[in-house]
Amino acid sequence: MRFQPPEDIFPSVKDWLELGAESKRKGIYKSIYPHFYLKKRVKNPPVRYPIKLAEGYAAIIPGGRVWGDNGAIVTPENKLIWDVSLEWVKNKWDHSIFKMETLPPVTHHYDAIADLTHVGSRNYYHWMFEVLPRLHLIRESGFTVNRYILKYAPKHSPFQSETMTHLGISRDDIQKTHRQFHIQAENLIVPSQPTFVTKWAYDFLRNSFLTENKLNPSINKRIYISRRETRRILNENDLIEFLTGYGFIKVELEWMSVAEQVQLFSGAEAIVAPHGAGLTNLTFCPPKTKILEIFPSTYITGLYWLISALGNLDYYYFIGASEQVPNAQQWHGYDNLTIDMKKFSSFFKNIGIK
């Protein structure tokens, strides 16, 4: 059976339950974690206060459908649910599902299937904070699950298989999405899809990967994280020479397992790094760890400042001169940068690392 693209959009699962058709009566919505307001902990943060962190919930959509590689959620009335179908588009109507003339034939599943898809699943930050915590919400809900739907590419992103195995999910439990993917479940279980750092996700990651592992802290206490691809520091050799004088060592996280990264960060006392997904591991740092994040002038975000605030870390940031990468499609998140070492040296000496 083929479907036309959705006829309309519900902003959220809760809106579908309140405004949808008769099928809503069979839907179930469980709020697991309420909204959380973050208290101010650092001076001059890179984002504005107050910070309202999203609610965590899990819901059952009887007869719900999942379409495409990114896992768009469609109701039995053929309407897209936006808050669990996010794509990086400016307008909701630019979602890829609306560019289809017809959708692929649907496969019916007469059991309970849980959706864990996310457009950014191949990125370490998005996987750790916006995919894995959804599994936690499902478990907290008490809903029975037969299989999980994932945007899953462990050969490209080995952290996916390592973390899923650690959390007790085997390859046989996973159904991978693809461009022609289109299923309808007897009971589609849909947890909320975080779009930013949340306290409950932070706590879940620490409880799952730090406490349970009982890791021995790394002997490397002062760490500089180097990037091999985008957002590189073009005069990095000058920076490394400076930091070496303060006992820092250079690491490349791309070559490390998740367990090794957790161990490294759990024993750190100071970390310097250009902005990048590896700083997701600040989640595992002990309180008061000094963090110095380096941004290009064209791309500044409060993502890792927020993780630092949740962990009571001593966070600072420094802004370098940006240089746009060719063919970056005008998105400045890929920009490389150059550091004015005279300014950096003065700034560094004022943050208390001796």
Regions found by a protein language model. Name each.
Residues 1-354:
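The feature primarily captures lumenal catalytic ectodomains
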